[in-house]
Every structure is written in C-alpha cells, then in structure tokens.
Curated annotation (Swiss-Prot):
The lineage of its organism: Bacteria, Pseudomonadati, Pseudomonadota, Alphaproteobacteria, Rickettsiales. It catalyses: L-glutamyl-tRNA(Gln) + L-glutamine + ATP + H2O = L-glutaminyl-tRNA(Gln) + L-glutamate + ADP + phosphate + H(+); L-aspartyl-tRNA(Asn) + L-glutamine + ATP + H2O = L-asparaginyl-tRNA(Asn) + L-glutamate + ADP + phosphate + 2 H(+). GO terms for molecular function: asparaginyl-tRNA synthase (glutamine-hydrolyzing) activity; ATP binding; glutaminyl-tRNA synthase (glutamine-hydrolyzing) activity. InterPro entries: Asn/Gln-tRNA_amidoTrfase_suB/E, Asn/Gln-tRNA_Trfase_suB/E_cat, Asn/Gln_amidotransferase, Asn/Gln_tRNA_amidoTrase-B-like, GatB, GatB_C_1, GatB_Yqey_C_2, Gln-tRNA_amidoTrfase_suB_CS. This is Aspartyl/glutamyl-tRNA(Asn/Gln) amidotransferase subunit B. Its EC number is 6.3.5.-.
Amino acid sequence: MAYIEGDTGKWEYVIGLEIHAQISSKSKLFSGSSTIFAANPNSQVSYVDAAMPGMLPVLNKHCVHQAIKTGLGLKAKINKYSVFDRKNYFYADLPQGYQISQFYYPIVQNGTMEIPTSTGDLKTIRINRLHLEQDAGKSMHDQSPHYSFIDLNRAGIGLMEIVTEPDISSPEEAAEFVKKLRNLLRYIGSCDGDMEKGSMRCDANISVRRSGEPLGTRCEIKNINSIRNIIKAIEFEAKRQVDLLESGEEIIQETRLFNADSGETRTMRLKEEALDYRYFPDPDLLPLVISDELINELKANLPELPDQKIEKYTKEFSLSKYDAEVIVADESVAEYFEQAANECNPKMLTNWLTSELFGQLNKASIGINECKITPSNFAKLVKLIENDTISGKIAKTVFEIMFETGKAPDKIVEEKGLVQVSDNNVLNTVIDEVIAENPESVEGYRSGKDKLFGFFVGQVMKKTGGKANPTLVNQLLKEKLSS
C-alpha cells in the first residue's frame, strides 16, 4: 500500500480509471468513413458523421466483434442484450449535439485484470464495464487569431470505454494497469494502444482518505496521454487534495486537466452527473442482440493472450516469470522468441535476446520487426555457443556483424576463422609455452597467489587470438599449474 505523506499523517490513494481505446477498424462506428490517422482535415467525413438531416447511423459489425473479443480477454460477462443511448451535451466538434454511447445496458460488464504490485504479489483490479461509443471531432484554436477550426475526421470513430472500480491504490499500480491493458488490446488486435496518436486515452478518478475511512470526494483528470504522465498526474492531484483537506478546506467534485509541462492539474469544469446528460435510448438504433454462437466463435479464434504466454514460457521453456514478462510485453518480441526458441536453448536465447539484441535495438532506435537478424539465424548463433563452436566473447563479435549485415552466423564464423579451439593437444601446447615463458608467475601462483590464474588465462587467450575454449583452458591450466 502506497501512502501520501501529509503534515498530519498518512493518506491513502483511491483511484479508478476510464480508458478510451480507439477500436482498430478501417471504418467508423456508425458510418463507412475511413479512420486513417493524420489525413487531411475533414477528408474522412460522411453525411452521418456531419449529422446532416435524415442521415441514419448503421452499426459497424467489426467494432462489435472487437468489443466482444476485448471483453473475453478481460474475463468479463458479454451481455447478450445491450442498448445505444444518446448522451446529450454541446461541443462545437460534436455535430449531432449528442454522443451515441451505452449507459444503461453496456455490451460488457464485470471483468478483471491482475497486475503486479510493489511487493511482487498479484492484485486483482475489477472492471466495471466496457461500452461502445463514438468519438468527437477536434477543435483547433491555434490556426487563426480570430477563429477556431473544426476537423471532423475523428468524429464517429469507434471507441471502447473501459471503466475500472476504484481498486487502484497507487500511481504505479495505475501505470501497471494501463500498460497491461494496452498489451492485452494489442494482442487481441482491438486497439493499437498508441497514446501519442490519441488512440488510447486515460482519465483518472482520484480521491484520498485516511486508512479505514469512507471514500472521499473524487476529481476526474482528463486525457492523460502517456504512462509517465499517469504517474505524475495522480501524484500531483492526490497531494493537492491532501493539502486542501489538511488546511480545513473541502474537495470540490470537478473535472480537471493535467498540464504535462508544469506537472500540475487545473480546473476544467464542475463534474457532471448522469442526469446532466439526459441519457435516453437512441431511437435510430435497434438494441444490440448477441448470440451464444457468435461469442463462442470469437472466443475460439482469440489469439494466445499475454498471461497464457507467460504461463507457457515458465512451464515449457523454464523461464523465470520476470524474463517471461519482459518478452511478452511486446507481441512482436514474443513472436520472434517463439520462432527462435523452437530451434535452440530457450534460456540461453532469452539471455541474448534481452541483453544483446534489446541493447542494439535501443541503440539503433528500431523495433524488432526492423531487425536484420532472422529468428532462425539468432537460434543458430545460440546453438554455436551451446555446442562450443564459438565462445561467448566471439559470439558478441559475430552478433554485431549479424546485426549490421543480417548474415548467418555460421558463414561469419567460417569467413573470419572464428571457430573456437577445443583440441586438448593444441591447448596443452599453448599452455606449456605460457608456463615456460613465465616461471616467476608460476612460482608465485604455486606459493598461494591465486589471482595470478587470470594472468595465465589471458596469456593463453592472447596466443590463440581469443579463440581458446575458456572452459577447457581453465581446466587444463589448473591441472598443469598444480602438477
């Protein structure tokens, strides 16, 4: 349990999240308009999106399927009967004068997700609901000193709003939840999770209380656009509330905006209640009825999800839970790993993947899909180390060449003459030379100066150009020096 340290004692965080995830779909929720990002302003707007009189919405079946699959991934109940409602409010970039959402009967309810805590335990976060709704357009106030401009390309794009219960007890837990949810959505293929492009946005409902006391008054922080800012926004807002309460003031229930530059939240508007939006069923849309057959079909076609992969990697490949989580955190990395793991030692592969490959990818600022080393060639490199064809040190040189050129490791080893020397007779000859050339060091070692052993190993490696099998060198040197 994390606490906020106030002047009068400790306070608890109470946090609930609302995640707006843009549905991966080529067309919008109720029209056939394209959803391509960064298109020319107002180039992807149908008469439905612009709310022209007489234009009726037509539900996108693919968006419904994406919501069902996401609900299944969240271990939630898929409601066979759900209804679209009109949420009435006025924004200039909302042409209809209302948003089509689901208030009374959402498509998904009562899910769960487990997240790791600071103690290493797993904590269950309850998902209250997932509902479908349409996005608004975008208002631009910096294009002219006299006018505001409206871009309706985003208007009508399908969103899944995923709402948690107030089960989150620290900024770090909130960040873990969003990271894990984003990864799940990417595996399912229902949202790309790109927070920079706005295809995943996070609102945080935050209150504070003394341990054991009732819930306090909450404030909602809108449109937090990165994992780092989730932590910053929650920390600032919780401290702001603690300072107010400790000075004898009350918390006003309101909606606030987080400023990433200043690291502060500011008042946006007083918090609305459901009554303010005058929800009522949309008369232009029939209730959504979902069959058991459809649910079962979508469930059968779900990909292997992150938690399932972690369990498989720890059981089948004997990886540590930590290593499994690191690999599974990126679907492309997990796919790469699985292709290579079928051809070599998975544990050794993991070590090289998470150290050498990740290091080079970060240095080059590229993703694993852009890497020139194929999974098969990576597996070949691991096998060359495993069967003592090359040493770990030589393997690093080979790996660097592979990363630059994409060449197969066996060809590089052959071209460069890098095969490890593992012949006892050859190594014994070299060791005899080293011992003969360094009588004083031999005498020193035999008189108890054990640290000199590293000197002898270094001399053997020098004479063999670094190609000597280090395990054999250690073994043979010990035998020679102790005789």
